[in-house]
Swiss-Prot record:
SUPFAM superfamilies: ClpP/crotonase. The keyword Hydrolase applies. This is ATP-dependent Clp protease proteolytic subunit. It comes from the Bacteria. Belongs to the peptidase S14 family. HAMAP family: ClpP (MF_00444). The lineage of its organism: Bacteria, Pseudomonadati, Pseudomonadota, Gammaproteobacteria, Alteromonadales. It comes from Shewanella amazonensis (strain ATCC BAA-1098 / SB2B). Keywords: Cytoplasm, Hydrolase, Protease, Serine protease. It is found in: Cytoplasm.
Length: 202
């Protein structure tokens, strides 16, 4: 029963059949799209998902370091450390990474959306974006809680600096606007500088 969710997922993923010189070859739809340099970041941002995204980015760089990569994002956010692993890899690799929000890009999802190549960050018309300050929770001795409180304040400051860099907004504006959940439409995200354009068609 341990593998039941994975089996159900695999059963629901469409397969694509291609004719090759050696006969038919079948791919799951995500592997086929990876051949077109399309990566999907869907769901909660956590360590396992981050490792898969990082691996795909590195693989596509090895395949062609000069051709852009398309990262489609539909995420409510998640772990800061997992998200930073993806973000740092996006900045590290040679290919330009175009980000596209489909559905929603919230919290760390919004941060990764903004971290795409300048001029290549997009939303579809009815998607939404949300920015806020990082969340944290810790139990333990008072001195350890104080240490973790300082750490999350440091993370908050770093993320605000990076959002300021990617959006062009002053730090004081970012600090004010991330104090609470701040939802934006696709058009508002363009005005804010989180993305560069709203895509309505190819």
């Amino acid at each position: 029963m341990h593998n039941a969710p994975e089996s159900v997922f695999n059963a629901l993923v469409p397969m694509v059949v291609e004719q090759t010189a050696k006969g038919e070859r079948s791919y799951d739809i995500y592997s086929r799209l990876l051949k077109e340099r399309v990566i999907f970041l869907v769901g909660q941002v956590e360590e396992h998902m981050a490792n898969l995204i990082v691996a795909q980015l590195l693989f596509l760089e090895s395949e062609n370091p000069d051709k852009e990569i398309y990262l489609y994002i539909n995420s409510p956010g998640g772990s800061v450390t997992a998200g930073m692993a993806i973000y740092d890899t996006m900045q590290f690799i040679k290919p330009k990474v175009s980000t596209v929000c489909i559905g929603q890009a919230c919290s760390m999802g919004a941060f990764l959306l903004a971290g795409g190549e300048k001029g290549m960050r997009h939303c579809l018309p009815n998607s939404r974006v949300m920015i806020h300050q990082p969340l944290g929770g810790f139990q333990g001795q008072a001195s350890d809680i104080a240490i973790h409180a300082q750490e999350i304040l440091g993370i908050k400051h770093k993320l605000n600096q990076m959002l300021s860099h990617h959006t062009g907004q002053p730090m004081e504006v970012i600090e004010r606007d991330t104090d609470r959940d701040n939802f934006m439409s696709a058009t508002q995200a363009v005005e804010y500088g989180l993305i560069d354009s709203v895509l309505t068609s190819r």
